[in-house]
């Protein structure tokens, strides 16, 4: 039983780490491409900024979904019922 709980905690930690890493890489690429495109065509900066914020919200959703799944596995572990 303790092995299942330990493996679940480790798995949830890895899930959160990869979600945070993916979100950070996504924000870095998004910011770099936004600055590059704004420097190339300054008249489109306001339109690009709106689209950038929409994509940034979707990138944040990845981390929030990972938090939700991790909390599900930690507090309402579906694998403990398989042991009985």
From Swiss-Prot:
Give the matching Pfam families. Answer: ATP-synt_C
Q: Where does this protein reside within or beyond the cell?
A: Cell inner membrane
What InterPro entries does this protein's entry cite? ATP_synth_csu_bac/chlpt (IPR005953), ATP_synth_F0_csu (IPR000454), ATP_synth_F0_csu_DDCD_BS (IPR020537), ATP_synth_F0_csu_sf (IPR038662), ATPase_proteolipid_c-like_dom (IPR002379), F/V-ATP_Csub_sf (IPR035921)
Any transmembrane segments, and where? 9-29, 54-74
Which UniProt keywords are listed?
A: ATP synthesis, Cell inner membrane, Cell membrane, CF(0), Hydrogen ion transport, Ion transport, Lipid-binding, Membrane, Transmembrane, Transmembrane helix, Transport
| Membrane topology per record | Multi-pass membrane protein
Source organism, top-level taxon: Bacteria
Q: From the UniProt record, which GO molecular function terms apply?
A: lipid binding; proton-transporting ATP synthase activity, rotational mechanism
Reversibly protonated during proton transport (site feature) positions: 60
Does this UniProt record's set of keywords contain Ion transport? Answer: yes
Predominant location: membrane
What PROSITE patterns does this protein's entry cite? Answer: ATPASE_C (PS00605)
Q: Which GO terms describe its cellular component?
A: plasma membrane; proton-transporting ATP synthase complex; proton-transporting two-sector ATPase complex, proton-transporting domain
Task performed by this protein? F(1)F(0) ATP synthase produces ATP from ADP in the presence of a proton or sodium gradient. F-type ATPases consist of two structural domains, F(1) containing the extramembraneous catalytic core and F(0) containing the membrane proton channel, linked together by a central stalk and a peripheral stalk. During catalysis, ATP synthesis in the catalytic domain of F(1) is coupled via a rotary mechanism of the central stalk subunits to proton translocation. Key component of the F(0) channel; it plays a direct role in translocation across the membrane. A homomeric c-ring of between 10-14 subunits forms the central stalk rotor element with the F(1) delta and epsilon subunits.
Subunit details: F-type ATPases have 2 components, F(1) - the catalytic core - and F(0) - the membrane proton channel. F(1) has five subunits: alpha(3), beta(3), gamma(1), delta(1), epsilon(1). F(0) has three main subunits: a(1), b(2) and c(10-14). The alpha and beta chains form an alternating ring which encloses part of the gamma chain. F(1) is attached to F(0) by a central stalk formed by the gamma and epsilon chains, while a peripheral stalk is formed by the delta and b chains.
What family name appears in the similarity comment? Belongs to the ATPase C chain family.
Which HAMAP family does the annotation name? ATP_synth_c_bact (MF_01396)
Specify the protein name.
ATP synthase subunit c
Protein species of origin: Haemophilus influenzae (strain PittEE)
Question: What gene makes this protein?
Answer: atpE
